[in-house]
Every structure is written in structure tokens, then in C-alpha cells.
Curated annotation (Swiss-Prot):
More info: The active site is a redox-active disulfide bond.
Disruption phenotype: Required for cell survival. Causes proliferation arrest at the G1 phase of the cell cycle under aerobic conditions.
UniProt cofactor note: Binds 1 FAD per subunit.
Annotated gene: pgr1
Binding site for FAD: S17, G18, E37, T45, C46, K54, A119, D315, T323, H453
Compartment(s) of residence: Cytoplasm; Mitochondrion
Name assigned to this protein: Glutathione reductase
Function according to Swiss-Prot or TrEMBL: Catalyzes the reduction of glutathione disulfide (GSSG) to reduced glutathione (GSH). Constitutes the major mechanism to maintain a high GSH:GSSG ratio in the cytosol.
Family the UniProt entry places it in: Belongs to the class-I pyridine nucleotide-disulfide oxidoreductase family.
Subunit composition and interactions: Homodimer.
Residues the record marks as active site: H453
GO molecular function: flavin adenine dinucleotide binding; glutathione-disulfide reductase (NADPH) activity; NADP binding
Keywords for this protein: Cytoplasm, Disulfide bond, FAD, Flavoprotein, Mitochondrion, NADP, Oxidoreductase, Redox-active center
Amino acid sequence: MAPISKVFDYLVIGGGSGGLASARRAAKHGAKVALIEASGRLGGTCVNYGCVPKKIMWNIADLVAKMKTAKQNGFPNSQLGSFDWGMIKRKRDAYIGRLNGIYERNVNKDGVAYISGHASFVSPTEVAVDMNDGSGTQVFSAKYILIAVGGHPIWPSHIPGAEYGIDSDGFFELESQPKRVAIVGAGYIAVELAGVFAALGTETHMFIRQSKFLRKFDPIISDGIMDHFQHIGINVHTNSLEFKKVEKLPSGELCIHQQDGSTFNVDTLLWAIGRAPKIQGLRLEKAGVKTLPNGIIIADTYQRTNVPTVLSLGDVCGKLELTPVAIAAGRRLSDRLFGGIKDAHLDYEEVPSVVFAHPEAGTIGLTEQEAIDKYGESQIKVYNTKFNGLNYSMVEQEDKVPTTYKLVCAGPLQKVVGLHLVGDFSAEILQGFGVAIKMGATKSDFDSCVAIHPTSAEELVTLV
């Protein structure tokens, strides 16, 4: 083993959102910090293959959906031309490249040593890095080591021909728009990408094992989005059995063989069946770090593993796999380790999240059923509203996108324990109401706020 070449206070493995946030915060507290990233690009899944490029595509798809009602809003000569997928990919890639550069400059500005290479544990305080520049292996040590390597898409490798498909990362590598796509999966990634494909004109098919998708969300979200998907022509194949095999035809099309003997041809097959922690090659056993059978690193709300010198956060821990969660957890961890804030840690309760579908949806807190299970049915009061926003007032009924809200309250004070939104502007609306709910707002607090009229959000302070 090569000798230890550098000693740090803090080694961060993984240059995604959580690792970057924790490394930079630790450096600002005066710690000597190194950040190790294998891919050669900082930003992690969110910047390179997740939130950012996805939201770019969602924005474009949402623009298309809005433009389809232009004639009904007084623009009789308005018409959509063909969509230039390749041009958008080039511009999107360039934008992501600029973000990668910004992250690297910020790391350097904060005095964090950026190490480009593949890390593996040597001991609970030592990490070996195979350097990406070909210079060989170097060994680094630190008082604390943070594992923030994120996750990766899962593939059904047991299905013959599955490799002819792509995953959510592969979506952003597509050079041209497929005419016909099959998406396998029932989570938010499958739903979001299906919405983008369909809005841009791709014939879109979703294959899900159960009767609905987004089953972990409140029914107003899963049912609301599913109803609208079917209304706009997305083909949702429910109770679908696992494919028998996938065959690549001479034409380049993919032929999906189903269990009943039927076949289905598409240009692109996208697997969105889940994600797994990216722990391959880390040699966690050398540090003694414990994981669950599925590879998730066991860590508490203070991000502590079973090894005192090793911390972990983000998707690799399986707790609320959301970028802002990893960022917040990373900063609080560094505040505790190096900033003198002894009890700093992230509260994983009441974290808002959004599904950028068409229509978009947002949620915070408990679903109606979760609230009943926790407090008892007699202690729960639910308020619902469904309406068409004023932005659809000039639009024919069949082209309107309904908005649905649900407020879940508990106890004699009717504390708001859950809020679920489906409809335009849900993400922006939820951020503000999320603050109120995090502060312990009650239904009477909501009622005491004078409505802003005319808005969709005013419905939440006028519910009866």
C-alpha cells in the first residue's frame, strides 16, 4: 500500500449535492477538507441526470401544453411547429457543463481540495483513490469521512434483452425524439418522463404492476395525475406482468414480448423501476460500515454510521431521496462536526416534495390514511376542493387541467398534518405553505390569512 500522502480533517466521498454542501460548509468553519468524485463532473445526479435537466425538459413540455390553448385565448393563427430535440439537448448539455464549472470554481474558492478519482476504504480513517489522471493510487486520511455517493438506476438484468432499453440517465443521452416509447415503472421518475414525452408528441405507454402509479402519495395525487394522463392520451397499462423478453429488430425498433404471447414495438424502452445505493467498489467492509441487504448504508438522523469516524447522507442512506434534503443534512452535519453546533441535524419530518408531472403535484406531511393510522379516524378532519383555475377561463372544458387540493388536520386544534396539491403552480404554492406547516400551523391559522384574489392558492385559506 502506498504511503499516506495527505491528511485532512474531513474527507467527502461524492461530489453530488449533499457532499458538496457538507464539504463547503466544513471548509467555511475552518476545516481542512477534500472532496473525492469519480465521474469527473461535480453536481451528482441532480445536476447531471436529474432535477436540473429534467426541469428544463418539463418547462419546455409545459410551454407546449400551454401553447395548445393559444387559439382559444385569442391567437387564431398560433400553431406549433416541430420540436427540435437535438438542439435542446445541445443547449441543455452546454448549460449543465457551465454548472459543472461553477461547482468546481466554488469548491476551489472555498479552499476544498478536489480529488478526481475512484475512492475505496482502506480503514475507518483512510481512503485509497485511483486517480482519474492516470497517476496511480494515492491514500488519504481524515478524522471524519463522509459517504455521499448517491444512487444509480436499477435494471431488470434477468429479463433477456433488457440491455436494449435505457434508464433515466439514458433519457438525457437521447440524440433524437422517439416516436413511440414504453416506460416501465410507477414512481415519480416514470411519471415525470412520461409527461414530458407525451407533451412533446411521442406516443407514450406506461407499464405498471398495480392498478395505479405513485401509490405512496395521497390518492388525490395518484388518481388526479393518472386521470389526466389518460385524458391526454398517455396509455397506462395497469396490472402489467413482467416482460418475457426484449428483442432488437433489424429496423432498430424494440419488440417487447409479453407473458401472454403478445408483442409490442417501440423506438425506445425506458426502465424506471427504482434506484439503488452506489456502493460498488467502496470496500465498506474495510471500514466496518454496516448496510442493509439492499446496500443502503445504515445511518441515524445525525448521519452517524456504526463506525464513529464514518458518516453518511443522501440517497445512499435511503432517507427521502431529494436534493434539498441531502444539502440540508450535509450543512447541518458540518455545523455539528466543525461549527460547534452540538445538536445540529436535519429533522426528516414534514419535508415538502413535488412531482413535476403534467399537471404538477406537491405534498408535505401525512396522507389521509397515514393521519388516520397515527391519530385515529375520529381525530382527523379533511378538507377538499376541486376547481378549474382562472387561467383556463377562456378554454374549452376538455382542454382544462383541473386543480385539486386536500388539507389533512388532526386533533381538537386541527393542526395541519398534511397538504396535497395537484394542478398548475403546485410547486411554488407548496414552498410557502410548507413553512407554515413546519411551524405547526392549524386550520384556524390558515383561515386567519386574508386571501389573495384571484389565485389558486387562495383556496387553501378559504376551505370549509
